[in-house]
């Protein structure tokens, strides 16, 4: 069936781009800062400023990934994957700008990062999120992530740790 045509119809182009090199590296850095401001948490305990200054850092291929989601060429969101010990990867800095939410971009970015993790041979992927981030938690649960005990020390209240296997586990 052909896509609808007519007045008011606009085809939206969504692209996931590798942001491990300029010029998208600066876009990713800006999105990371926006993410940090939006969650309203000081991430100094994670070495956030050092992370920004050294991008792509741990998110560089082949062990990591740094993606920017573009909608009609406009930066709409981001996400990253980095290696942890023991054949485990970690999703970080998952963020979709409010104006672009509800289009499945977060899922698209997360799926691409999970695919990269599987291709890299990671046995599992972990993440941490905050209790108030209900939409993010629901997304992760729908993708097969389950709550686990803390895998690192985080001084923030209400941190939820999650993990998902990379093999062919049910989502």
What is the predicted role of each segment?
Residues 15-92, 97-98, 110-112, 116, ...:
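Acetyl-CoA-dependent GNAT
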